[in-house]
Amino acid sequence: MSTSILRRILDPTRKPKPDAILSISLLTTVSSPPSPPSDPLISDAVSILTHHRSKSRWSTLRSLQPSGFTPSQFSEITLCLRNNPHLSLRFFLFTRRYSLCSHDTHSCSTLIHILSRSRLKSHASEIIRLALRLAATDEDEDRVLKVFRSLIKSYNRCGSAPFVFDLLIKSCLDSKEIDGAVMVMRKLRSRGINAQISTCNALITEVSRRRGASNGYKMYREVFGLDDVSVDEAKKMIGKIKPNATTFNSMMVSFYREGETEMVERIWREMEEEVGCSPNVYSYNVLMEAYCARGLMSEAEKVWEEMKVRGVVYDIVAYNTMIGGLCSNFEVVKAKELFRDMGLKGIECTCLTYEHLVNGYCKAGDVDSGLVVYREMKRKGFEADGLTIEALVEGLCDDRDGQRVVEAADIVKDAVREAMFYPSRNCYELLVKRLCEDGKMDRALNIQAEMVGKGFKPSQETYRAFIDGYGIVGDEETSALLAIEMAESLKLRAEEES
């Protein structure tokens, strides 16, 4: 049976019969042990490797063949060791270390098969990447195609496992050989042989990441044959590699990142209606985030309720998604209710949970509640990000109470010292302006000095703030001098830019 399948792969002119659609999981080979080698060198090498102690086998092996082994000889020796894949790998590394074999795709393929059939995934993948590098020296043939053909030709003799083709596709993806991975998938699929679902998902994800969500979606349709036949027939044809939630989650995330939130909804409908796949909590989270990003909170809340009806357990990501969406859309009261619900269910908050609430309160003009959450956040050992701190600063500076700007300056000072916070120019200028308006010139000068130390040259707005500030406290002389300095500075800056 395996010989027939391999012939179908190697011969591009042959077309499989309609009833010959086989899963790659059926491509298994049970071969008899290799016949005794006719070359005495090979039998001697096998004997040394299998019967000598580990400390002596390598020196004895070098004495046996100082000039090294040909790739063909290496393959024959390794075939005799195929039931001991770790020894086969050590033999390979030994020949590489002492330059005892000029390995090619043929010798690498033998070892790849032996490692694959023993599920030594990482080692097999490493040898596949080496084979791809060795194949790159041949300018007349695509290197991935060359390795693929070599694996096919040696498949039966090595008693390999279909898993080897999945490793080849994934190794191509790791090496950024997208075209090569697609080519292997197409060659297998054209003969009715399917890769594992994890391999299909990896291919779709990588195409989406490197070539855009739309191309990833096209690859999904091709991999699962959804454009070849009717939907009902496609469901039958997919068989054992029916797309799973991970497949759809990957595509939804890709479209969401590109801002195509309507496509997120389309993928969701295909998942449920066309393929009949059940979404998981991650799927719901992505859909809710897509609605929240568009401000469609009523739709997001419907998804939230659907999760409850279907018995999908909310995780921290689900809570953070809804809390963030509600806070961004001025529904901080509902967000606070979800926050309390988290506590009742024993779900630990994350830094992001608190940041959403702080930003939500500040956006709604309730900076005092934002400060309460911020202080609770710090008590629990979380450090807010820059946007959250600047939201607090803006909220405090909008309050005309003179002490609030001092509170804002203290928050920035502590954040710079404790959390490696780097205020933006706008943050510095806002503090300077409000301090000057309240006549707190010494504190404003300290902020301005720190601002210059961070590489922010005084702008016209900064000069204006100090000029007005010194005027407020009655220091007209300093105010006038700053006006002259500002004019000279702006003139010099204009000359430098021209």
Swiss-Prot record:
Swiss-Prot/TrEMBL PPR repeat ranges: 244-274, 280-314, 315-349, 350-384, 385-423, 424-458, 459-489
Domain of life of the source: Eukaryota
Keyword match Lipid biosynthesis: no
Ranges in coiled-coil conformation: none
Keywords attached to this entry: Repeat
InterPro entries named in the record: Pentatricopeptide_rpt, TPR-like_helical_dom_sf
Keyword Lipoprotein: no
Pfam families linked: PPR (PF01535), PPR_2 (PF13041)
Gene3D superfamilies to which the protein is assigned, alphabetical: Tetratricopeptide repeat domain
The family this protein is said to belong to: Belongs to the PPR family. P subfamily.
UniProt-recorded name of the protein: Pentatricopeptide repeat-containing protein At2g15980
Organism: Arabidopsis thaliana
Lineage, top ranks: Eukaryota, Viridiplantae, Streptophyta, Embryophyta, Tracheophyta
